[in-house]
C-alpha cells in the first residue's frame, strides 16, 4: 500500500501538467532571480510586439498542439525552433533567445509542448511522444 502511495506522488509530481503562474508569483523583488525575471518579462513584451502567427497541428494521438511563429523580414530562410524545458512556459523561456535569433534574420518558432500552455495533453512524456509531434 505504501509503495502505491509513493508511486502516485511521484507520478503527480513528474508527469502532471504544472501550474507555472503559481511558481512565478512566489518570486519576490528581493530574490536574486528578480532581475532575471524582469529581463525575461521585458523580452516577452518585446517579442509580442513582433508580427506573429499562432500555429496549430494535430498530433498522432489527436491532441491539438500550438505554437507561435515569428517570421523574419527576410522571406523564406532558416527557422530556429526554441524548445522550452520541463514544466516551463514556452514564451517566457524562449522570448529572450527568440528575440536574439529574430534580430539575426531568422524565423522563430516557439512551440508549446504537450501538456504545456494552450497545447492539449494531460501528461508530460519526456520526449517519448513529443518526438513524433
Model-based region annotation:
Residues 77-85:
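Short beta-strand element of the alpha/beta-hydrolase
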Residues 90, 116-133:
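Catalytic nucleophile-loop/oxyanion-hole region of alpha/beta-hydrolase
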